[in-house]
Amino acid sequence: MLSEQRYHIILDLLEKNAIVKTHALCQEMGTTRETIRRDLMALEEKGLLKRIRGGAMKADASESDG
């Protein structure tokens, strides 16, 4: 699976759930934790999500907490 495909899946899951867990993403996409970690880092750099321990949350959800 290409990284852009994984990004799309991650962002779709974040639209449905405020938080996604790394373990669940690994199972969903059949990839390693390291691959998911790199994907989450790339999406965070683009401002599309906020990484948290064990997963990620919507970027806008983290802004409204402050």
Please identify what each model-predicted range represents:
Residues 2-23, 27-28, 34, 40-66:
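HTH-adjacent hinge/linker in prokaryotic transcriptional regulators
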